[in-house]
Amino acid sequence: MTTEENKTSRNRKRKRQRNPKPSKEEPIETTPKNQNEKKNQRDTKNQQHGGSSAPSKRPKPSNFLDALRERLSGGQFRMLNEKLYTCSGKEALDYFKEDPQMFDMYHTGYQQQMSNWPELPVNSIINWLLSNSSSLVVADFGCGDARIAKSVKNKVFSFDLVSKNPSVIACDMSNTSLESSSVDVAVFCLSLMGTNYSSYIKEAHRVLRPSGMLLIAEVKSRFDPNNGGADPKDFVKAVCDLGFTSVLKDFSNKMFILFHFKKKEQMNSNQKIIKWPELKACLYKRR
């Protein structure tokens, strides 16, 4: 090889050493900067498609707020329910006069509780009325949403602590505006709640005609003497001492008990001292 050829060969070797070709099998290093750029590109792509780089485990806001509202509503219902069972009718009337919205809140909670019952006592009373003459005049003490008046053709006087429609008369149920001996049927459907419940029954006796019917539906646990409730025999005796005769005692339902009484034609001249049993308050536990 000539001197020129050797020189040219050495130059080619130096050039290859200065600019080596990368091996096809050798991985090209990725710098942290490149990794961050790729992550940012992925996050941007996810955001553009409504996605997220990590799935959220939090509940949907609407579901959370609904659950919170339901919990607050349930707590307020329990508070109002306890108040109604532990105060007089006059005190309850004054309370709801100051804040009528509390009455709406109570009845919303009440309807939720009733939705868990397999059978509603108001339907038993409605069926009784439908099976009798529509000419009977009815007084519904503690009418709630006035379902009885909406379900029968009878003339119905609907009483409750607050009136939300013209057909309901707001009053203390121990002192209604009805004339004496003016109605044929008096109804108490889960409404003997005040500490002075006996005065409600006395008012029903006043407004009923002779031979008029008194229909009472109450929570069964209130008449369970083994668990702090009243003895139903004592309750029936007190009502009969007031001037009624017992017609029906129905314990067959799991949730409520039915009493039917008839007003006596004539009252005894000797007034008895009536011993009214204390009815157990029906309080709902927090779930």
Curated annotation (Swiss-Prot):
One of its GO terms (biological process) is methylation. It holds the Pfam family Methyltransf_8. Signal peptide: none annotated. It is found in: Nucleus, Nucleolus. Its EC number is 2.1.1.-. Residues 1-62 are annotated as: Disordered. InterPro entries: RRP8, RRP8_N, SAM-dependent_MTases_sf. It is an enzyme of class 2 (transferase). S-adenosyl-L-methionine binds at H107, G142, D160, D172, M173, C189. One of its GO terms (molecular function) is methylated histone binding. Residues 35-46 have a biased composition (Basic and acidic residues). Residues 9-21 have a biased composition (Basic residues). Keywords: Chromatin regulator, Methyltransferase, Nucleus, Repressor, rRNA processing, S-adenosyl-L-methionine, Transcription, Transcription regulation, Transferase. PANTHER family: RIBOSOMAL RNA-PROCESSING PROTEIN 8 (PTHR12787:SF0). This is Ribosomal RNA-processing protein 8.
